């Protein structure tokens, strides 16, 4: 658990080749940098075992500062460079999550050069999609 009130709170766990993040925003660059440092060993262990996927579920807000978006771009670059890229990425946010309509297109654009990305309103749909992607990957 990485608390950083009032600028983000992110927790993670792994279940059956899927890395799940629970993310409560808004987010600043410091929380994203903290995630990079804290979860890199976990991500490395997961990647060492073969293909994996990623689901982030957002609570309260998806808004992010420019510094957070820069740090996020750095995170994806590090994942790509280190061979830690998930084969699928799903973001889950209900329609009432602050900043959803603004941030989802930004995240979709950032992921476009990285690995498949889809947005969902419901966690169950996101999980089903990433599990399908994993099954297809073998």
Predicted regions and their residues:
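Amphipathic, Lys/Arg-enriched alpha-helical "gate/interface" segment within cytosolic domains
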Residues: 1-138
């Amino acid at each position: 658990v990485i608390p950083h009130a009032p600028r983000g709170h992110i927790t993670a766990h792994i279940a059956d080749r899927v890395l799940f993040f629970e993310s409560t925003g808004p987010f600043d660059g410091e929380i994203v940098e903290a995630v990079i440092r804290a979860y890199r060993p976990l991500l490395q262990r997961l990647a060492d075992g073969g293909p994996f996927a990623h689901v982030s579920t957002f609570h309260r807000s998806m808004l992010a500062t420019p510094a957070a978006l820069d740090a996020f771009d750095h995170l994806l670059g590090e994942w790509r460079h280190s061979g830690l890229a998930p084969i699928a990425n799903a973001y889950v946010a209900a329609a009432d999550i602050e900043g959803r309509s603004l941030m989802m297109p930004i995240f979709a654009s950032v992921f476009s050069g990285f690995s498949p990305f889809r947005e969902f309103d419901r966690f169950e749909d996101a999980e089903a999609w990433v599990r399908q992607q994993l099954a297809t990957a073998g």
